């Protein structure tokens, strides 16, 4: 019988010094981020200031009260060909094939008169919402949560900047609430007695979602207390422990692209667990026109740099490649 693999080491980092601590405390946090992202690729952010109980309450209420008719009317194009949207909307369960459901929404600043909305720029969509009389607190909460978790992500990026040997405001100009392409996804995994078929990894592990790299700058995830994630390490696949009210943070592919893979996106996957749970990732993105110059932190000097690329083009190509590899979520 094989020996069970030990869980991956995922440190918990108090990020509060990044919001006003002294230089030494900020440097210490940056060193902890650096170590985590160079080892397992994940860390938990504590003292983040977000009310996660309210987050759970609102998301559970939303998934509990959505009707089948509402889900279809708001479904993205992959599920409802009458809807041209490919990002914002409902991602439906498919009877006998797929049980997980989710709602994705984008920047509340993307109003009808936003320049990128008016021009029809790819990856930009003004949000649609479920009936606001039936779901009275959903839209106001979601829009405020977007602003809150975007602000949290900008704080985290100060730590990443310092970890990379840059000034703490290095990423600030690339992260504007007016044009960020960041997305929130509210994923609900149900418990079902007759669960539809699931995928199987090469090692025989039953999976809800196969191995992948997140397409983002960083991903900031809140999840309920059901262990499900695994990260690929030199020793094989290891479980990522859960951590109560803390947010799980990892680098996305753009961070690897930008830093010459000094901070690579960790390869991870979702185990099949037949238990009701929530997985609520925030994918941090720059704006469409943002162009950052890739660079080499100390350990990667001598390697050829990636060419600069407009962020919106990078996001579109990488997102399409992920869907082609792993299928529509």
Curated annotation (Swiss-Prot):
Residues reported in the UniProt entry to bind N-[(5S)-5-amino-5-carboxypentanoyl]-L-cysteinyl-D-valine: 87, 91, 189, 212, 214, 279
Residue stretches making up the Fe2OG dioxygenase domain: 180-286
Cofactors required: Fe cation; L-ascorbate
Residues the entry annotates as binding isopenicillin N: 87, 91, 189, 279
Residues engaged in binding 2-oxoglutarate: 277
Keyword Oxidoreductase: yes
The keyword Iron is assigned to this record: yes
Gene Ontology MF: a single term: isopenicillin-N synthase activity
InterPro entries according to UniProt: DIOX_N, IPNS-like_FE2OG_OXY, IPNS-like_sf, Iron_ascorbate_oxido_reductase, Isopenicillin-N_synth_CS, Oxoglu/Fe-dep_dioxygenase_dom
Pathway: Antibiotic biosynthesis; penicillin G biosynthesis; penicillin G from L-alpha-aminoadipate and L-cysteine and L-valine: step 2/3
EC number(s) reported in the record: 1.21.3.1
Gene3D superfamilies found in the cross-reference section: B-lactam Antibiotic, Isopenicillin N Synthase, Chain
GO biological process: antibiotic biosynthetic process
Binding annotation for Fe(2+): 212, 214, 268
Pfam families attached to this UniProt entry: 2OG-FeII_Oxy, DIOX_N
SUPFAM superfamilies on file: Clavaminate synthase-like (SSF51197)
Reactions this protein catalyses: N-[(5S)-5-amino-5-carboxypentanoyl]-L-cysteinyl-D-valine + O2 = isopenicillin N + 2 H2O
Keywords: Antibiotic biosynthesis, Iron, Metal-binding, Oxidoreductase, Vitamin C
Function: Removes, in the presence of oxygen, 4 hydrogen atoms from delta-L-(alpha-aminoadipyl)-L-cysteinyl-D-valine (ACV) to form the azetidinone and thiazolidine rings of isopenicillin.
Family: Belongs to the iron/ascorbate-dependent oxidoreductase family.
Protein name (Swiss-Prot/TrEMBL): Isopenicillin N synthase
Gene from which the chain derives: pcbC
């Amino acid at each position: 019988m094989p020996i069970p693999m030990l869980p991956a080491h995922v440190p918990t980092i108090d990020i509060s010094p990044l919001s006003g601590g002294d230089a030494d405390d900020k440097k210490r946090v940056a060193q902890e981020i650096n170590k985590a992202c160079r080892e397992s690729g994940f860390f938990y952010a504590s003292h983040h200031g977000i009310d996660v109980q309210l987050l759970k309450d609102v998301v559970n209420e939303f998934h509990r009260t959505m009707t089948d008719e509402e889900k279809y009317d708001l479904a993205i194009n992959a599920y409802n060909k009458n809807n041209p949207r490919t990002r914002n909307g409902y991602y439906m369960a498919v009877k006998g094939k797929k049980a997980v459901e989710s709602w994705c929404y984008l920047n509340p600043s993307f109003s009808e008169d936003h320049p990128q909305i008016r021009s029809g720029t790819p990856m930009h969509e003004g949000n649609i919402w479920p009936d606001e009389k039936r779901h009275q607190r959903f839209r106001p909460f979601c829009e405020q949560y977007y602003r809150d978790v975007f602000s949290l992500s900008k704080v985290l990026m100060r730590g990443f900047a310092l970890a990379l040997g840059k000034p703490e405001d290095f990423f600030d100009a690339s992260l504007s609430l007016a044009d960020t392409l960041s997305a929130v996804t509210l994923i609900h995994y149900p418990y079902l007695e007759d669960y539809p078929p699931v995928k199987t990894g090469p090692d025989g592990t039953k999976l809800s979602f196969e191995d992948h790299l997140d397409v983002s700058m960083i991903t900031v995830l809140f999840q309920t207390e059901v262990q499900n994630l695994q990260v690929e390490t030199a020793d094989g696949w290891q479980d990522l422990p859960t951590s109560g009210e803390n947010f799980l943070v990892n680098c996305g592919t753009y961070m690897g692209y930008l830093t010459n893979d000094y901070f690579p996106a960790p390869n991870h996957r979702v185990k099949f667990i037949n238990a009701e749970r929530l997985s609520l990732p925030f994918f941090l993105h720059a704006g469409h026109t943002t162009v950052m110059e890739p660079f080499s932190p100390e350990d990667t000097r001598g390697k050829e740099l990636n060419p600069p690329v407009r962020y919106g083009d990078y996001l579109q190509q990488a997102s399409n490649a992920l869907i082609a590899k792993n299928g529509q979520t």
